[in-house]
Design a protein with these regions (language model features):
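Predominantly extracellular/luminal regions of secreted and cell-surface proteins
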Residues: 1-28, 99
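Short charge-dense sequence patches
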Residues: 1-7, 38-48, 85-88, 123-131
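Short low-complexity stretches enriched in small and charged residues
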Residues: 8-9, 20, 53, 61, ...
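Acidic, metal-coordinating catalytic segment for phosphate/diphosphate chemistry
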Residues: 15-52
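N-terminal strand-loop-strand
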Residues: 40-76
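Unchanged
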Residues: 82-170
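Charged phosphate-binding loop/patch that engages nucleotide di/tri-phosphates or the phosphate backbone
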Residues: 166-182
Length: 182
């Protein structure tokens, strides 16, 4: 499995990330990718890579969030790499599948944000880490939304209201970056 492109993306992001905690997470993810040749597969026991889409409207006032069915949290769309080393393509694929939005524009080929978060055990799946690379994507809020089986709901949320739905540091960091303060 080819991990060079993933490592290049991570190292480039690590060098420009302003937040010390995010820099530290990027370094942890680099070490994880270097240590696990199967990091792009769900079968990688300690965790695996995921790609997420931080979908904003053109004026950068709203973000499209999904109310995740399994986790019960409002989050950005995203999902497992399932062997695909092109995490930009993973983020775009997951965004289309989870929102029904087809007209998505990758704002930058660079990583927008990274996060490392614990996924609790569920059924036969043990707890594990998601090492998430997030990409900034633009969409038109007028395009119809289609709620997938993975979601309870979808909503375009004013950036000022994101913290009321999900006060996690990583969500607030992406809000701050979107409004130009991070």
């Amino acid at each position: 499995m080819h991990r060079t492109a993933v490592l290049q993306l991570l190292r480039a992001h690590q060098s420009v990330a302003a937040d010390p905690h995010e820099q530290s997470m990027a370094a942890e993810i680099v070490r994880f990718v270097e240590a696990h040749s199967d990091c792009l597969l769900r079968t990688c026991a300690p965790g695996h890579l995921t790609g997420s889409a931080w979908i904003v409207d053109a004026p950068r006032c709203r973000v499209l969030l999904t109310h995740h069915r399994k986790l019960g949290w409002w989050l950005q769309p995203g999902g497992h790499a399932d062997g695909d080393p092109d995490l930009r393509a993973v983020a775009l694929r997951e965004a289309r599948e989870e929102t029904g939005v087809t007209q998505l524009r990758l704002v930058s080929s660079a990583v927008f944000d990274v996060d490392r978060h614990w996924i609790p055990p569920r059924g036969d799946t043990p707890g594990h880490w998601h090492h998430d690379l997030r990409f900034l994507i633009e969409a038109d809020p007028a395009e119809p939304l289609v709620i997938s089986d993975e979601s309870h709901d979808l909503a375009w949320v004013e950036l000022s209201r994101v913290s009321a739905l999900n006060p996690e540091d990583s969500m607030l960091r992406m809000v701050q970056k979107t409004i130009g303060r991070g």
